[in-house]
């Protein structure tokens, strides 16, 4: 599933590919359960992300519509010549220059609706670092933080954008905090500020590296990869590493961690 880095890169791709295009029509693959909606005869498109959330902004003479989209397990966008959309394209925007922006979703888990950001998700740890930190600290008394650190890092209400591989790298690179401690204790420890800093730093590094080379993810065309951080395989030290331990956590996801924390 795309995490913060991949969703932000998706927004970059869309913005880079459609910046000067004018669109006139929207189409939907009838095999998808999502609703087809009407658009003005002439509109522009831009994209923005917040954690794992993604929006297309449809700007026209009457204002701007906010199309909130979930990427599902493997959703992404692709620009092609109109009529040459790739297989599993489910929502298509046709431009006047003869190209089409398509939402491609092999597993059809992605959804769309006209809405603002989800009120049940917290601030973006990268784009709104202070807001993220303040939000976590102001909610530490909530029962959610009684759970182990490794599970709470997956709670999108507080850690919007942190997913399976990012939590593994955050905890591993923090180094000396037991991931099975209650999250509240870990955050209030003398390493708590470092933990929250890594929740911003690690997703941003993954973004600079072009996103996770995991499963169906491919870095979008035209995205600059910052090689100063090394290669993705060098950077990814914990997740998927056969020398690490792994368990199924309380939410059914596989958690990779340093063997020193094995109980």
Locations of regions flagged by a protein language model:
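Generic detector of intrinsically disordered, low-complexity, polar/charged segments
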Residues: 48, 69-72, 128, 158-160, ...
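A sequence-level detector of short, solvent-exposed, charge-rich linear segments
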Residues: 26, 33, 168, 172, ...
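C-terminal accessory segment of soluble enzyme catalytic cores
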Residues: 200-263
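Hydrophobic alpha-helical segments with strong N-terminal bias
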Residues: 36, 145-147, 236
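Gly/Gly-Pro- and Ser/Thr-rich, intrinsically disordered tail segments characteristic of DNA damage-repair
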Residues: 1-112, 188-201, 222, 231, ...
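Phosphate/anion-contacting hairpin/loop surfaces
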Residues: 63-176, 180, 185-200, 251, ...
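Short secondary-structure junctions and interdomain/linker hinges
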Residues: 17, 21, 143-147, 160, ...
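Short hydrophobic "helix-edge" motifs at membrane interfaces and signal-peptide entry regions
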Residues: 41-43, 152-154, 242
